[in-house]
Amino acid sequence: MSDWNYDPYARLGEVPSFTLTSDDVADGAPMAARHYGEGSGGEDVSPHLAWSGAPEGTKSFAVTVFDPDAPTGSGFWHWALYNLPADTTELPTGAGAAGFELLPHGAQTLPNEMRLRQFIGAAPPDREHRYFFVVHALDVERLDLDPESTPAILGFNVHFHTLGRAQIVTTATPDGAKG
């Protein structure tokens, strides 16, 4: 059973928040079918994300998508980007596609839990799950990570450089992509 009060970022300490919006997903609302995984009736399309009001001194951003309710004991990372330049304020719908054409120059994508360098959509197997879309404002221009690092390693490094955090938490159900 999920603990809906569990916030995976709460134990990292408080940091200033800034604004994250989307043309495709909304905080507390179910995810549209196209943002589900292909195996669940979706298209693995990453949603549009736009942010503003990042803290002064922001030198780069990281973006992560995490399902803390996955039945793994450690959650499930759907997407992990880092080294987005400080002047980046938006990712268009589909930016998480495998070809990286819609990502800003210099942005790096780590393999997700499926070991794919792309966004992988929602696929809750058992019940409603939450999906944390998080933009992290960082105090360094770049993180030098092994390109095969896991999203958890990214999170560890992000923790020590976070100036602020913005998030949208969406939901998905096993039958959500079927309408």
Task: Describe these PLM feature segments.
Residues 1-179:
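N-terminus-centered regions that define maturation/targeting leaders and the start
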